[in-house]
């Protein structure tokens, strides 16, 4: 059996549609067949900082008090790399890159 395709779900960003992108990411995550695909969630804060988010954090994004959700400012930034076989994403902690994962497809609602 071959490895599952890894999808990077990228959402948020420096846009007036930030909250809508977050809500759309929740819907997309719910629709992805997790038996066939692995998902890496990457949120972009309103200030433009990229971060890895757990799938549980994404699933919990909701409208609250009439306000759309926001990607929080990250403690550690996510970075994109060109890997041996294509794209990779990693988390930068100080001067080190940790949790490096290959990515096959990027989906940005």
What does each model-identified segment do?
Residues 1-109:
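ATP-binding N-terminal substructure of ATP-dependent carboxylate-amine bond-forming enzymes
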